[in-house]
């Protein structure tokens, strides 16, 4: 697992009845994403004095449900700009290829 630069930005919020935690991760932050037998994980790291780290684990069934909802949401709104569309399309194709059956050899 290695950290990669964040090329855009992310915001994370966790709401509890008596408090909320909010963190932003921008171009000076890093991320890691990995898969194991049961789930995927996304880790966001903001280094420095105000260091923050957020990790989310999603089991494959939930990840599939989230991807379906994201597809529905994107289809129901005005088309994304060309750069974001191309970036997402390239990533989706790479995900698709990684899920193709592999020979046992």
Say what each PLM segment does:
Residues 1-105:
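Positively charged, low-complexity terminal tracts
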């Amino acid at each position: 697992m290695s950290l990669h630069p964040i090329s855009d930005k992310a915001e994370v919020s966790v709401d509890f009845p008596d408090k909320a935690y909010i963190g932003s991760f921008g171009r000076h932050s890093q991320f890691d994403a990995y898969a194991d037998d049961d789930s995927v994980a996304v880790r966001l790291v903001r280094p420095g004095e105000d260091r923050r780290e957020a990790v989310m684990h999603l089991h494959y069934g939930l990840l599939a449900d989230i991807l379906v909802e994201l597809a529905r949401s994107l289809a129901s709104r005005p088309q994304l700009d060309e750069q974001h569309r191309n970036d997402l399309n390239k990533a989706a194709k790479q995900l698709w290829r990684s899920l193709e059956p592999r020979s046992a050899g």
